[in-house]
Amino acid sequence: MEQQKIRNFSIIAHIDHGKSTLSDRLIERSIGFEKRLLQAQMLDTMAIERERGITIKLNAVQLKMAQGNQQYLFHLVDTPGHVDFTYEVSRSLAACEGVLLLVDATQGIQAQTISNTYLALENNLEIIPVINKVDMESADVEKTKQAFHQLLGVDPNTIPLVSAKTGLGIDQLITTIIEKVPPPKGDESKPLKALLFDSYYDPYKGVVCFIRIFEGSLKLNDKIRFARSNSVYQIVELGIKNPFFEKQDVLKAGEIGWFSAGIKKLRDVTVGDTIVHAEDTTTPPLPGYKKVLPMIYCGLYPIDNNDYQNLKMAMEKIILSDVALEYEYETSQALGFGVRCGFLGLLHMDVIKERLEREYNLKLISAPPSVRYKVLLTNGEELELDNPSLLPERSRIKSISEPFVRVYIDLPDHYLGTVIDLCQNFRGQYEKLEEIDIDRKRLVYLMPLGEIIYSFFDKLKSITKGYASLNYEFDQYQVSQLAKVEIMLNKQKVDALSFIAHHDFAFQRAKKFCVKLKELIPKHLFEIPIQATIGSKVIARETIKAVRKDVTAKLYGGDVTRKKKLLEKQKEGKKRLKAIGSVELPQELFSHLLKDED
């Protein structure tokens, strides 16, 4: 199809504002799509996405649309809405000319909506504001229109109003997309230049790559070269998604599609790479693709050490479709061989762990997450550590700096006081208060990332009944009074349970930690002391009592000395067992430790 009839666009929005449902309605309106094949969340292909009702992976689909007697080609990229997956949004925007900025009329513009707007503006994309859920009783359409007017300066009367659930206003939206999203500008006659914006591993085809052709064209059997790895492959299969995989012989400038080339070396494929023809050595790579840096770090260890090689293989495959994931191999004294991973947030961590367990049949234990600290030693040397157990002795440390993030919290007026108290309790530094509209405010705080990753978000949702939304961005490192708290079980240090806490909150955190461990670790045949220490000083302690076996049950009548003898023998046995016995940790221990009870 000629380029003037192609429209490449993404749908971006806050979580739960209806992106996937709107995608379903657009797919439903496309030419040639059979309605019997439609299912809810059509573009959410992972089981975990359907169960949680959220989008995790971006997904691109080609749709043929009719407008009057003209046919158009839409390339729609559905994107996640959660703050942890912002990098997926930035990847999809690199392949588009326009975006639909979708807002739920019952909730208004949220913190993540504004963050996504800035992403679109940075990429110089045409932004089409769209108001969804206008048919609901609680919808405040006029207020949302005014909020869009303040944010983007658009005429409130030109904003499309839709209900993705019922299909209201979808036809008008299609017309708006055709009129406002500019067609791609690529030249088919120029040498091939394509952006690799996503990939995944197929056990039969090898690596399957999703690309946007910016210049030239790509044909079946063409030889291609990856600009970064310099690897050369021959195209085996080529095609589009509509939303099912469909093979084609050629992809032209402006189009979005996929290819497989029998790629088995996973390291050859890097999302964000530029693809050119094999003989082309002069075409420069496409600019502007940013590498995303992890925010939190966590160790993953297989319960069965024999699964370690399977875990290594699984990590190589999963990183193909998740460029934000970083990992390196490590060994824990308590948990054995594993990988230390860098994630963008707690949801990202949960999703990766769940995918590893489901897709690769692994049983994993995850250590408590931490952030990356900068440590200045007394000899002037600087270290960067993301594993608390590697922190040097206190006598060698001059200062420890921790990452601070700028937090944006959008909330209704009447929760303002309680949220300010919450931020102060999490060592927040107040910056400013902004007015969004008559009854909504935006709080801006500087906060330590190490505090946010524990229970801040859950507590925020709890005290605001779910009405607050949160977004954050890295600001800077600040020197803080921090200490390493080590946990000892049965007088043995468990390195995977170490954590770093602020001096003012170390005792409180350590006490809670010990109490939780007491609840979560099952009773053994011997008594287990749980101790939290800073250096050589014990700051908190709990004890798990031994399981009592009634050794006198088989006695009847007779001499009391026989009973005493059996009890003494049991006592000696427990002492011996305590000296050599190891404490078994349940698999779900670490995830439960993260959930703050109060």
Swiss-Prot record:
Localization in the cell: Cell membrane
Reactions the enzyme catalyzes: GTP + H2O = GDP + phosphate + H(+)
Enzyme class per UniProt: hydrolase
GO MF annotation terms: GTP binding; GTPase activity; ribosome binding; translation elongation factor activity
Superkingdom, taxonomy of origin: Bacteria
Record gene name: lepA
Family: Belongs to the TRAFAC class translation factor GTPase superfamily. Classic translation factor GTPase family. LepA subfamily.
Stretches assigned to the tr-type G domain: 4-185
EC number: 3.6.5.n1
Organism in which the protein naturally occurs: Mycoplasma pneumoniae (strain ATCC 29342 / M129 / Subtype 1) (Mycoplasmoides pneumoniae)
Predominant location: membrane
Official protein name in the record: Elongation factor 4
SUPFAM superfamilies in the record: EF-G C-terminal domain-like, P-loop containing nucleoside triphosphate hydrolases, Translation proteins
Keywords on record: Cell membrane, GTP-binding, Hydrolase, Membrane, Nucleotide-binding, Protein biosynthesis
Annotated NCBIfam families: lepA (TIGR01393), small_GTP (TIGR00231)
Mode of membrane association: Peripheral membrane protein
Pfam families named in the record: EFG_C, GTP_EFTU, GTP_EFTU_D2, LepA_C
Role summary: Required for accurate and efficient protein synthesis under certain stress conditions. May act as a fidelity factor of the translation reaction, by catalyzing a one-codon backward translocation of tRNAs on improperly translocated ribosomes. Back-translocation proceeds from a post-translocation (POST) complex to a pre-translocation (PRE) complex, thus giving elongation factor G a second chance to translocate the tRNAs correctly. Binds to ribosomes in a GTP-dependent manner.
GO cellular component terms given for this protein: plasma membrane
Biological process terms in GO annotation: positive regulation of translation
Residues the entry annotates as binding GTP: 16-21, 132-135
